[in-house]
A protein has these predicted regions:
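Glycine-enriched alpha-helix->loop->beta-strand junction motifs that scaffold or abut catalytic
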Residues: 87-90, 119, 205-212
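Active-site mouth loops of central-metabolism enzymes
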Residues: 18-36, 96-106, 185-196, 247-256
Length: 256
């Protein structure tokens, strides 16, 4: 496990518009936007020197009160990152966040190992627990076990690249002597944890390489960093370094 920056530090990026259309955030022009517009935003972010673009993840948005602020357009993160990766050169490609419980960890390892292989290791696997209970129900996944599923998924994805054939025996997933490839050339896939509370901060310290603040104010950062470091120490990771993936909001200058 390793941070992207040698000593750990802040990286700045944005979740491009268009690929996700929550009602509260989408602007009218996005309704008619095309993949070419999405690409233009990503290439502009690269030209401006941003560190990453981030693509969100929802699979089956329910028609209920909780999800009433969500539309049904959410581009698949793996397909979208692959497409953007083929049309950019240096900007990193982040899932922000992949809801780990929705996919078997071997599938996640295969998808993101392939992305890393195809994009000169520009991929960051950002993972989270998820929050839309109706979506879990639609997929037949126990919403109340999402934290445990996330923890085991992180461990299993890391382990998938440890050798040519690997085995895993956990409470949620079990398999023996299977190979996953291609793997990242370095043998390591950066994994960032996203979330808005102390559970995500502690999970970062115990298992992650970086943290994605989601809705955190700047004055919370000292507490977040202290919690990550304490959790890392308690997990025997005192020497670990961590990145922070910061996504400021965007502002339009002129017409989109």
């Amino acid at each position: 496990m390793a941070s992207i920056t040698p000593e750990g530090g802040a990286l700045y990026g944005l979740p491009p518009p268009i690929q996700t259309l929550p009602r509260a955030l989408a602007d009218p022009w996005e309704d008619d936007a095309t993949p070419a517009d999405l690409l233009r935003v990503a290439q502009a972010a690269e030209a401006a020197g941003l560190d990453f673009v981030g693509v969100c993840d929802h699979v089956a948005v329910p028609d209920d009160d909780y999800a009433s602020g969500m539309r049904t357009t959410w581009y698949d993160p793996v397909a979208t990152l692959a497409w953007l990766g083929a049309r950019t050169e240096s900007i990193r490609l982040l899932s922000v966040v992949l809801i780990a419980a929705y996919r078997h960890p071997l599938l996640t390892a295969s998808s993101f190992g392939t992305l890393a292989h195809l994009t000169d290791e520009r991929v960051i696997l950002g993972v989270g627990a998820g929050h839309v209970e109706g979506e879990f129900a639609a997929l037949g996944i126990d919403y109340h076990r999402r934290g445990k599923l996330l923890d085991e998924c992180i461990d299993a994805v890391r382990g998938a690249f440890a050798d040519t054939y690997v085995s895993h025996d956990g409470p949620e997933y079990s398999y023996r002597d299977v190979g996953v490839g291609p793997a990242p050339a370095s043998g390591d896939l950066p994994i960032w944890v996203g979330g808005s509370g102390s559970a995500a901060w502690k999970r970062t310290g115990r298992r992650g390489d970086g943290y994605i603040p989601m809705g955190a104010s700047r004055d919370q950062y000292p507490e977040i960093i202290d919690t990550i470091r304490t959790a890392a120490d308690e997990a025997g990771r005192s020497d670990a370094t961590f990145d922070i993936g910061i996504m400021p909001g965007w502002a339009y200058i002129g017409d989109p």
